């Protein structure tokens, strides 16, 4: 066994109705004034006000910032940072899906150390602790409440930059399954499959360890056996709890084992065409699972048995059975059949032709190759391989 290390330095509260613990946790943090960073959907539903009211119950003031898009931009981080500084807040509550989480982490850095989020792009460029952060996810998907990553879109480059630093891990996380029951089916599907891919890619990563494998296996079992049920009925609290727990385990797993070609390739798709992150991942997954099958050394069987209604045994299993099972799962939960459909579904300017998409394949592949996730994908990949995979996904 190779040497590996791990540290999970966060305080995580899990349980139905645990949003009510926010005042207690904020007091523990020592905060007097919060900026709640969330999204417009939660604001309309009254959940942002509910969080603010919880804080007010212990005399903690709360301002809000909810102007956040699906793939948050450098400009959004600048606006949210300005709101934080103007408000006089001394801690942040990240309340929502992956987008508010990413923005909150970036604001925590820039508000503390100045400059632009682009100054912290890459690994370990955050000089020290950031503004204290409480993370409250409302989707079972990103795992961002337990990861050391913030992903922000730089439209000047059509590029999704990543800030990677253990300094940006939220100090506290609250996982309340009641909060994810409000998600539309399409969001539940995209976020749920994203969480599954976090676990799957961490599991087959060349950087995987016994620790990350244990978490990834548990995550895949929780998500794979409940995602169809949860997408069908978001009020199924038992399925919601399983999805949220699975997302948590997957987030910790990939924090240590990294990801792979799916995430490396999906970020450029979102940057160039504004496809939601989870959808881009899901469309690419079967194509890359087929590509990686050559490198499988037994883990595909475990993954298959987590998502297939009919279990298989080692003596009858073929890796392509997993690829077929992934396609079946994606179809069942309403994921677009291919990248062309996903891009057109996301388009705000009319039809995007296959030729237009193909013209972006080379620059997307160039950007994908910049991702550190390529290096831990189980099958080695060159730029020409990435271009080929994009074409297969069309």
Model feature map: region roles:
Residues 20-35, 54-58, 86:
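Glycine-rich phosphate/diphosphate-binding loops that line cofactor/substrate pockets in enzymes
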Residues 19-22, 44-47, 74-75, 99-105, ...:
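Short glycine/serine/threonine-rich phosphate/pyrophosphate-binding segments
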Residues 202-328:
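Active-site segments that bind and position negatively charged phosphate/pyrophosphate groups
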Residues 310-394:
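C-terminal charged capping/lid subdomain of soluble metabolic enzymes
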Residues 43-115, 229-240:
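N-terminal small/polar loop signature for handling phosphorylated ligands or for N-terminal nucleophile
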Residues 112-208, 299-302, 306:
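A glycine/threonine-rich phosphate-anchoring loop and its flanking beta-alpha core
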Residues 1-29:
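N-terminal amphipathic/basic leader segments beginning at the initiator methionine
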């Amino acid at each position: 066994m190779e040497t590996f290390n791990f540290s999970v330095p966060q305080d995580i509260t899990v349980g139905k109705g645990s949003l009510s613990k926010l005042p207690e946790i904020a007091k523990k943090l020592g905060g007097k004034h919060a900026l709640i960073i969330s999204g417009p959907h939660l604001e309309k539903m009254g959940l942002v006000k509910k969080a603010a009211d919880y804080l007010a119950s212990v005399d903690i003031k709360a301002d809000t910032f909810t102007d956040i898009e699906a793939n948050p931009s450098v400009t959004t981080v600048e606006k949210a940072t300005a709101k934080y500084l103007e408000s006089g807040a001394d801690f942040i509550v990240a309340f929502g899906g992956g987008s508010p989480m990413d923005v909150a982490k970036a604001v925590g850095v820039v508000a503390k150390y100045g400059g632009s989020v682009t100054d912290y792009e890459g690994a370990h460029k955050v000089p020290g602790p950031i503004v204290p952060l409480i993370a409250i996810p409302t989707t079972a998907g990103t795992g961002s409440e337990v990861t050391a990553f913030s992903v922000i879109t730089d439209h000047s480059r059509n590029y999704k930059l990543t800030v990677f630093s253990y300094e940006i891990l939220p100090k506290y996380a609250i996982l309340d399954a009641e909060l994810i029951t409000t998600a539309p089916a399409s969001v539940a599907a995209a976020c749920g499959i994203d969480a599954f891919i976090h676990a799957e890619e961490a599991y087959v990563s060349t950087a995987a360890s016994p620790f990350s494998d244990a978490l990834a296996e548990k995550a895949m079992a929780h998500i794979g056996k409940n995602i169809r049920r949860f997408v069908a009925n978001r009020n199924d609290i038992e399925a919601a709890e399983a999805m949220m727990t699975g997302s948590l385990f997957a987030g910790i797993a990939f924090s240590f084992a990294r990801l792979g070609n799916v995430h490396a390739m999906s970020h450029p798709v979102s940057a160039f065409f504004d496809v939601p992150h989870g959808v881009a991942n899901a469309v690419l997954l079967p194509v890359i699972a087929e590509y990686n099958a050559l490198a499988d050394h037994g883990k595909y069987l475990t993954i298959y048995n987590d998502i297939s209604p009919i279990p298989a045994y080692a003596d009858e299993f073929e890796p392509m059975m997993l690829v077929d099972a992934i396609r079946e799962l994606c179809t069942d939960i309403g994921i677009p059949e291919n990248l062309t459909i996903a891009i057109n579904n996301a388009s705000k300017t009319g039809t995007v032709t296959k030729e237009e998409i193909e013209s972006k394949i080379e620059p997307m592949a160039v950007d994908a190759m910049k991702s550190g996730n390529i290096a831990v994908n189980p099958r080695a990949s060159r730029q020409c391989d990435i271009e080929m995979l994009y074409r297969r996904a069309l």
